[in-house]
């Protein structure tokens, strides 16, 4: 017998996936160069040459049993240390490898985090507009999913609306900056205001309210725009990162929490 709630989550088709399949069909007829695919987030820019060079070097110089074998449950230590060292150098933070878990891209990382926060009756808040898969991820984990309207026309976080929607059952706020689909980058001023609000509400309710920072687009900014690193502004932040966008590697499924 099938789990009815799980079946219900997968019963409705994704229009994004349907568009991707349609694009593949059209490409077979008119040629891929004549199809402009705005469905999935597949890159149109090749991965950096250093990625291919590194893959070749690893294949040539490393024991295949190590390449294709299991790692520790939390991921290879050297990889976690490299990530930690990189973030420390870029953002002036003091992370250690033990704080990181290697994941198969941001989506399963988010699912794991949602499940970890899904105590009975818990809820999670997203800021509109949001990546559509957040909702089924949260519902599958057993979380109530609520949406905070954006501050129009800036699309920054509407802190007044956020405060009205936070309850004692609120476990986390999920943020995506730069945002998919709006492209907005939440400013440091906005994030500091959110941090102050969450610190106050956490103290009021007697438990931490986390920020889940979904950051696959962290490096994809232009015109000198800077993306604030949220852990620098709010202690109870869980970062879910993927190299799918920054290195054009969506098929490799590499990321970290």
Predicted regions located by residue number:
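Short catalytic/ligand-binding loop motif for oxyanion handling, primarily in non-cytosolic enzymes
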Residues: 44-48, 181-184, 219-220, 248-249
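Glycine-rich "substrate-gating" loop/helix at the edge of Rossmann-like oxidoreductase active sites
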Residues: 7-11, 149, 182, 244-246
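Residue-level marker for buried hydrophobic side chains located in beta-strands
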Residues: 211-212
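N-terminal small-domain helix-loop-helix segment of the aminotransferase-like
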Residues: 2, 9-105, 112
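Conserved core of the PLP fold type I
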Residues: 64-206, 218-234, 238
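Walker B catalytic acidic pair
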Residues: 215
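Short aromatic-enriched loop/helix-cap "lid" or pocket-rim segments at secondary-structure transitions
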Residues: 48-52, 222-226, 251-253
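Active-site PLP attachment segment
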Residues: 231-257
């Amino acid at each position: 017998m099938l789990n009815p709630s799980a079946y219900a989550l997968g019963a409705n088709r994704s229009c994004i996936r349907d568009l991707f399949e349609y694009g593949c069909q059209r490409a077979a007829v008119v040629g891929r160069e004549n199809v402009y695919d705005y469905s999935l987030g597949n890159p149109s820019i090749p991965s950096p040459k250093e990625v291919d060079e590194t893959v070749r070097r690893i294949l040539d110089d490393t024991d295949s049993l190590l390449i294709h074998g299991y790692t520790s449950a939390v991921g290879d230590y050297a990889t976690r240390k490299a990530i930690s060292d990189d973030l420390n150098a870029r953002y002036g933070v003091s992370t250690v490898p033990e704080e990181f878990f290697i994941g198969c891209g941001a989506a399963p990382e988010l699912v794991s985090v949602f499940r970890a926060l899904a105590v009975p009756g818990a809820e999670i808040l997203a800021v509109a507009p949001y990546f559509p898969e957040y909702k089924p991820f949260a519902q599958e984990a057993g979380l109530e999913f609520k949406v905070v309207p954006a501050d129009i026309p800036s699309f920054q976080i509407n802190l007044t609306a956020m405060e009205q929607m936070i309850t004692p059952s609120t476990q986390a706020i999920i943020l995506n900056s730069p945002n998919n689909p709006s492209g907005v980058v939440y400013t440091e001023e906005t994030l500091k205001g959110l941090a102050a609000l969450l610190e106050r509400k956490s103290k009021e309710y007697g438990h931490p309210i986390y920020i889940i920072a979904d950051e696959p687009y962290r490096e994809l900014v232009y015109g000198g725009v800077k993306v604030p690193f949220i852990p620098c502004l709010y202690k109870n932040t869980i970062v879910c990162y993927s190299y799918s966008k920054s290195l054009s590697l969506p098929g490799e499924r590499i990321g970290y929490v």
